[in-house]
UniProtKB/Swiss-Prot annotation:
Cofactors demanded by this protein: a divalent metal cation
Assigned keywords, A-Z: Lyase, Metal-binding
Cofactor note text: Divalent metal cation.
Name this polypeptide is given: Putative 4-hydroxy-4-methyl-2-oxoglutarate aldolase
Gene Ontology biological process terms in this record: regulation of RNA metabolic process
Gene3D superfamilies tied to this protein: Ribonuclease E inhibitor RraA/RraA-like
Subunit structure: Homotrimer.
Entry's EC annotation: 4.1.3.17, 4.1.1.112
Function according to Swiss-Prot or TrEMBL: Catalyzes the aldol cleavage of 4-hydroxy-4-methyl-2-oxoglutarate (HMG) into 2 molecules of pyruvate. Also contains a secondary oxaloacetate (OAA) decarboxylase activity due to the common pyruvate enolate transition state formed following C-C bond cleavage in the retro-aldol and decarboxylation reactions.
Amino acid sequence: MTWTTPDLCDRFPEVAVAEPLFRHFGGRTTFSGPIATVRCVEDNSRIRELASTPGDGRVLVVDGQGSLRHALFGDQIGAQAVANGWAGVLIHGCVRDVEILAGLPLGVLALAACPRRTERRDLGDVDVPVNFAGVAFVPGHWLYADANGVVVAAAPLSLEVVGMEH
């Protein structure tokens, strides 16, 4: 049996549940992993840098301040993330190239799509706690996402103990 976020909430009441703000854009709707973070506003320089490093099954959480004016993530960075082993991304902002993202074996959650590319000014913070959707996303904590929503735990959940696979 595989996990679902409702099952995780039932079995682990201490998990944080993100407000239901996000849409799935990637080829995977179920994904999980340790969190890495970027805080940026309309500049995806740090996202591009991180996507080109080994993901090791991590989930990149991006606090784009909820901006709907520019896309922070698209097909090129998505392809880099897949090639480097990232499990998924959660973006408090926009994506673009949605037809291509839908074909990638990557979890991609974002607020919306926007065709305008980002500005690149080499700005942003990496591996800092970020807060949005009613949740604190801390580097090293774990994110679990599926079609039901997003939950965050301070440590990996013992899924095998409750008969679930990771």
